[in-house]
């Protein structure tokens, strides 16, 4: 077997593993729960699995092979811009039917990928197994989002719980790392990288320091107990308006117990570890916290420069809000479709770097840019401080 073939076998196995994870999540839930919309920004769990199977089939059959027999009637259900979130529950198949349908189209797709006809191999999307990487990463991102849905479901169904430990506040340590002085290359040219990670370009530091660790639960509690949610001067104008509207006073999954706090997760209630990264805060809260701590959020390039120098610790617990908006790199070219990144370069989306406990290896890389609007709290997001 040639090296290239080995790569392909591994990628096919990865795709199959992603699909199995999705099936497992659906398979162990009560029948009714897969069609519930638990949060206005999230889709029903059943929709996610159907969408992943649809997207896989759409790219392989409709785009590469020009055969729309399976997908033609499903565009209005599974293309996000053709079916608003609130309408999705009514389209979710019954659990067994969903498992059977997604299982069947997925097996057919795997067989096609394992032994593609000659004209399929020539397609530009098949070069360097691009489409396989793309589909694996697509599944990986939806699987993470399915965990956000599971956490919202816990918020809905779980009763009172007694934490095993008391969370006590701690002042932010502010252990700072010096950002590299010399220019650092930002982005990734690997074939698997998304359009928004390219092209690579040099960045020279502006600020000087970035925190070694993300902000912790204990530090965030200090902000709360110091009336961080009530001090207007810590908030930007839009941030304050957002707060006034939502009346938020703690991270999204935190719950108050008699003498302390705990948090809900995709796997149920759990203690808030004092040194674990705080999760479930939006950009505005991250911004207010950093002002309270006498710091600021890092620009995404500061974050990436520090991550490339191997400096950052505590990675992979939460997505970390960056100071800047999501924007195209100089020389950006959209691929494999206009809609992946371009619509979100709208000055309303912030950038998140790093990755959470639910982020799977195919999308865990230093150059990966996640993006959400500034008010989102259902994602597993926290922050890391920076200083000039
Ligand atoms: C990059 C996570 C914001 O969920 O909308 C999934 C990823 N794009 N299917 C999203 C995505 C198309 C995207 N995020
Ligand atoms: Fe998608």
Describe each region flagged by the PLM:
Residues 300-305, 367:
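Short, structured beta-strand/loop micro-motifs enriched in basic residues and often containing a Trp
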Residues 197-201, 227-248, 314-388:
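Surface-exposed recognition segments
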Residues 62, 310-311, 331:
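Single-residue recognition of alpha-helix boundary sites
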Residues 189, 302-303, 321-326:
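Histidine- and/or cysteine-centered catalytic micro-motif in compact active-site loops
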Residues 56, 304, 328-329:
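Hydrophobic positions within alpha-helical membrane elements
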Residues 306-315:
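Cytochrome P450 C-terminal beta-domain/meander region
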Residues 2-13, 17-29, 33-37, 41-45, ...:
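Extended beta-strand/loop cores of jelly-roll/beta-sandwich
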């Amino acid at each position: 077997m040639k090296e290239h073939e080995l790569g392909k076998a591994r990628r096919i196995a990865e795709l199959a593993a992603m699909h199995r994870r999705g099936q497992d999540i659906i398979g162990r839930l009560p029948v009714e729960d897969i069609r519930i919309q638990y949060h206005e920004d999230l889709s029903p769990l059943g929709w996610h699995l159907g969408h992943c199977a649809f997207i896989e089939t759409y790219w392989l059959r409709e785009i590469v092979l020009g055969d729309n027999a399976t997908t033609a009637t499903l565009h209005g259900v599974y293309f996000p811009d053709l079916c608003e979130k609130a309408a999705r529950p009514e389209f979710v198949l019954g659990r067994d039917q969903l498992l059977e349908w997604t299982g069947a189209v997925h097996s057919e797709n795997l067989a096609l990928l394992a032994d593609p006809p000659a004209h399929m191999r020539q397609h530009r999307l098949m070069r360097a197994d691009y489409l396989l990487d793309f589909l694996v990463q697509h599944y990986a991102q939806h699987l993470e989002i399915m965990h956000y849905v599971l956490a919202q479901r816990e918020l809905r169904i779980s009763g009172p719980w007694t934490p095993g430990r008391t969370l006590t506040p701690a002042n932010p340590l502010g252990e700072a790392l010096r950002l590299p002085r010399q220019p650092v290359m930002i982005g990734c040219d690997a074939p698997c990288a998304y359009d928004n990670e390219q092209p690579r370009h040099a960045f020279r530091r502006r600020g000087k320091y970035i925190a070694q660790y993300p902000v912790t639960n204990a530090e965030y509690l200090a902000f709360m107990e110091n009336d961080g949610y009530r001090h207007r001067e810590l908030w930007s104008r839009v941030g304050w308006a957002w707060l006034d509207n939502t009346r938020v006073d703690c991270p999204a999954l935190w719950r108050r117990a008699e003498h302390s706090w705990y948090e809900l997760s995709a796997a149920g209630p759990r203690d808030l570890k004092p040194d674990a990264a705080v999760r479930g805060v939006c950009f505005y809260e991250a911004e207010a916290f950093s002002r309270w701590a006498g710091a600021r959020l890092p620009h995404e390039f500061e974050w990436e420069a520090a991550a490339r120098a191997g400096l950052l610790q505590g990675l992979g617990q939460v997505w970390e809000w960056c100071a800047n908006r999501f924007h195209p790199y100089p020389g950006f070219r959209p691929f494999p479709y206009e809609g992946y990144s371009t619509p979100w370069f709208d000055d309303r989306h912030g950038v998140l770097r790093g990755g959470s406990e639910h982020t799977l290896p195919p999308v865990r890389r230093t150059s990966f840019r996640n993006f959400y609007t500034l008010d989102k709290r259902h994602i597993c997001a926290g922050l890391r401080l920076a200083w000039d």
